[in-house]
Structure formats: C-alpha cells, structure tokens
Design a protein with these regions (language model features):
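Intrinsically disordered, low-complexity proline/glycine-rich segments
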Residues: 1-161
C-alpha cells in the first residue's frame, strides 16, 4: 500500500508555505511594481496565516471505515511518491467499502477547485453513506485556508442539500 497523508498542518508544511519562491537576489532585480506586489502578498499572508490544508483526493484515498476511492481514468493526475500517477478524485466518484458495498463522494472543494468541470474531492470529503475520506497517497498538492478569510459557500458542502 502507498504511503498515506492526512490534512495535518505540520510545522514543516507551515515553514514551506512561508518560504518565498524568490531569492533575495531575484527580488532585488525586479522592478518596483513587482516588489510592491510581493510585499502586499507577504503582508496578506502575515495578516491571514494558514489555518488548514486540504489535500486533493485521488484514486487510492482511504476512508474512516476502510473504503478506498476506486480508480477512474482522467487526464488530470497527480504524481505519487512511488513514481506512479493517480487520477484526481471528484464528487460523484465511487468508493469501494471493505464489505463490498459502494458509496459516492458527496462533498468537494466546490467552485474553489474544479477538474474539467467537476468538483475536486478532498481529504475530509464526505461520502453519501456518512463515511469520510481521511487520507490520500499524494502529498504535494493541497488547498489552504487562511485565518479570517472564508471559504466558498460550496466548500465541503453536500450539493443539492
């Protein structure tokens, strides 16, 4: 079985998120307008620190009750640590439960994150049987929420409810 990752916001992830993608030399070489944009973004990040991460779900995710998100062939895939690619899971995808029944992913990132018109599922997405996705085999791709900034109205909300 592939390594699994949760939505735990670790000190390592916080440090990674706080790291600038630009070196001091790159910033110094930028024009004043570009440096101003970077400074504004940094101020926003300090005012509204990350308070949660939401990993993107893929085939192979595990649910609280031991279900596994079934493989679906999609163009949109994420690279796993083992070098394999896994299709991104979306609302409506099937989860195979340990006793042989199936359930459907019922909640997603909503309009915050879509994949070819379908709502992307997340770790913490609920299933139509009350189960919940708790981990994913991919560690690199996630959404963040920030203190004081609300998520979209359809974020992790059952659609049609």
């Amino acid at each position: 079985m592939d390594q699994q990752y949760s939505n735990e916001l670790t000190p390592e992830i916080v440090a990674e998120l706080e790291m600038s993608p630009f070196t001091a030399e790159e910033i110094a070489a930028m024009d004043q307008d570009s440096r101003a944009i970077i400074a504004e973004e940094k101020a926003l990040e300090w005012k509204h620190p990350v308070n949660a991460i939401w990993r993107i779900a893929t085939e192979g995710n595990i649910t609280r009750c031991g279900g596994i998100v079934a493989p679906v062939e999609r163009e949109s895939k994420l690279l796993l640590d083992n070098g394999r690619y896994a299709s991104i899971a979306t609302a409506g995808d099937i989860v195979t439960c340990p006793e042989g029944s199936t359930a459907t992913i019922a909640t997603s990132a909503g309009a915050t994150s879509m994949c070819n018109g379908a709502d992307v599922a997340l770790v913490d997405s609920l299933l139509d049987n009350g189960d919940e996705i708790i981990s994913t085999p991919q560690r690199h791709t996630y959404l963040v929420t920030r203190e004081g900034i609300t998520s979209g109205a359809d974020f992790l909300t059952v659609t049609g409810a």
